[in-house]
Amino acid sequence: GEYLLLLNNDTEVITPRWIEEMVMYAQQERVGCVGVKLLYPDNTIQHAGIGFGYLTLAAHMHKNFPVGHPGYMGRLVYAQDVYAVTAACLMVRKSVYDEVNGLDESFAVAFNDVDFCVRVREAGYTNVFTPFAQLYHYESKSRGLDESPAKRKRFESEVKRFQQRWAKQLAAGDPCLNPNFDLMKEDFTFDIKPLE
């Protein structure tokens, strides 16, 4: 096939022409990965693109916003370039996937999708979020939470490896977002510092 669709088994389709919506962007030469709007079962946003450098690494933008909310500057109602998207539902041309050597298996669970998207960006492509393809994501239903000591250790190891691999890019920040945002929040709050 020409396109690959990475799709978690804990998702449920909401919009009927979601695959066509994703292909519309994935077929464009400049586009690497395409991600969708993922909702929690309570109809709040789980994923609408990933902000890079947030919460020290990466975070889902608009997380927990209500489904009908337009988002910061309307970003929940139009397709746009984003730094990364989640592999819970990600489409990419097979040629791009092969060009960057696919997912890095050393990131067993955490950051494998963000690492992949950064490598796609480094290869000269852009990643796109579309709000017109929507799915429910029953997050962590299939793999569970990272609460056991072994899972916690694996997660911490993946965090460290990600920080080492992408230190330069993390320091540069996310060109798709305003550099004045508070990077410790996912809600587009500005980091306002008092004048001295």
Residue ranges and their predicted role:
Residues 2, 32, 83:
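Conserved acidic residues
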Residues 18-22, 76-101, 105-136:
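A short, conserved alpha-helix in the catalytic core of glycosyltransferases
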Residues 1-2, 28, 102:
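Active-site acidic short loop of glycosyltransferases
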Residues 11-55:
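Conserved donor NDP-sugar-binding/catalytic core segment of glycosyltransferases
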Residues 42, 54-81, 91, 127, ...:
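C-terminal, non-catalytic tails of nucleotide-sugar-dependent glycosyltransferases
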Residues 8-10, 34, 93, 107, ...:
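Generic structural signal for small/hydrophobic residues in well-ordered secondary structure
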Residues 1, 34-37, 130-131, 138:
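Short glycine/serine/threonine-enriched helix-capping/active-site loop
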Residues 1-14:
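Short beta-strand-to-loop acidic/aromatic patch adjacent to the donor-nucleotide binding site
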